[in-house]
Swiss-Prot record:
UniProt cross-references to InterPro entries, sorted A to Z: Cytidylyl_trans, KdsB, Nucleotide-diphossugar_trans
UniProt-annotated location(s): Cytoplasm
Catalysis performed (reactions): 3-deoxy-alpha-D-manno-oct-2-ulosonate + CTP = CMP-3-deoxy-beta-D-manno-octulosonate + diphosphate
Matching HAMAP family: KdsB (MF_00057)
Reported function: Activates KDO (a required 8-carbon sugar) for incorporation into bacterial lipopolysaccharide in Gram-negative bacteria.
GO cellular component terms, semicolon-separated: cytosol
Protein name: 3-deoxy-manno-octulosonate cytidylyltransferase
PANTHER family: 3-DEOXY-MANNO-OCTULOSONATE CYTIDYLYLTRANSFERASE (PTHR42866), 3-DEOXY-MANNO-OCTULOSONATE CYTIDYLYLTRANSFERASE, MITOCHONDRIAL (PTHR42866:SF2)
Pfam families in the cross-refs: CTP_transf_3 (PF02348)
NCBIfam families found in the cross-reference section: kdsB, PRK05450.1-5, PRK13368.1
Length: 245
């Protein structure tokens, strides 16, 4: 991977309906966005990391912290559309879409995400982690099922696969919202209209699957907590404080 120019982009909007201004909410005394940026830089695998936002409040935060940021249009339909705006002005081989609500990312997550690009046919990658029992029916925890070769078959907020006979299936996998794209695949995503399933599930990655574009799902060690609610915020804060000890 050292020969590839990998650019990390953190799409950061403050219009979240479930947890308004969540990327700027404080966790252990620092805005969540600062934790995410630091985690991305600590991976050691991204040549550059920058914030992409449509909010002046986020731009001001970046200026105060000395973090690279770029202003993107408000009408971007998804985080990946925002990454594509960045790609039009900054060249790279691989673009990593880093969710601004994942402050618990570690270098191991980035290693797992980027390793599949050693295979030339891989165009898009993302991650899965074990799904805990209390997350299986939680629509905020997106489940993923894959083919034997790691290609994603489907992502859903519903419980997939459905254990019809209650046989005690224990292999549920949760999607971790970290994506990496070769430039051509990123362009293809951004030039396609939002798809039917994408709009139903509110999951941008379904735009690729509905249009026949493979997503390689790498299995990552451990799990994280994506911050969608006040409860998530408190749980992440406790875990990050313990990690700092």
């Amino acid at each position: 991977m050292s020969s590839l120019n990998v650019l990390g982009v953190i799409p950061a909007r403050i219009g979240s309906t479930r947890l308004p201004r969540k990327v700027l909410r404080e966790i252990a005394g620092e805005p969540m966005l600062a934790w995410v940026y630091r985690a991305a830089r600590a991976s050691g695998q991204l040549r550059q990391v920058l914030i992409a936002t449509d909010a002046e409040e986020v731009m001001e935060f970046a200026r105060q912290k000395g973090l690279p940021a770029i202003f993107t249009p408000e009408d971007c339909a998804s985080g990946t559309d925002r990454v594509f705006v960045v790609a039009q002005s900054i060249d790279a081989d691989i673009y990593v879409n880093i969710q601004g609500d994942e402050p618990m990312l570690t270098p191991a997550h980035f290693t797992a995400l980027l390793a599949p690009f050693e295979q030339p046919h891989v165009q898009v990658t993302t991650l899965s982690v074990p799904c805990s029992e209390d997350e299986i029916a939680n629509p905020n925890a997106v489940k993923v099922v894959t083919a034997a070769d790691g290609r994603a078959l489907y992502f859903s907020r519903a419980t997939i696969p459905y254990d019809r006979d209650a046989a005690g299936f224990i292999g549920y996998r949760k999607h971790l919202g970290l994506y990496a794209y070769r430039k051509a695949a990123l362009r293809r995503f951004a030039t396609l209209p939002p798809s039917r399933l994408e709009e139903i599930e509110r999951l941008e990655q379904l735009r690729l699957l509905e249009n026949g574009i493979d997503i390689h799902v790498a299995e990552a060690p451990g799990s994280t907590i994506g911050v969608d609610t006040e409860e998530d915020l408190r749980a992440v804060e406790q875990l990050l404080l313990e990690r700092k000890k």
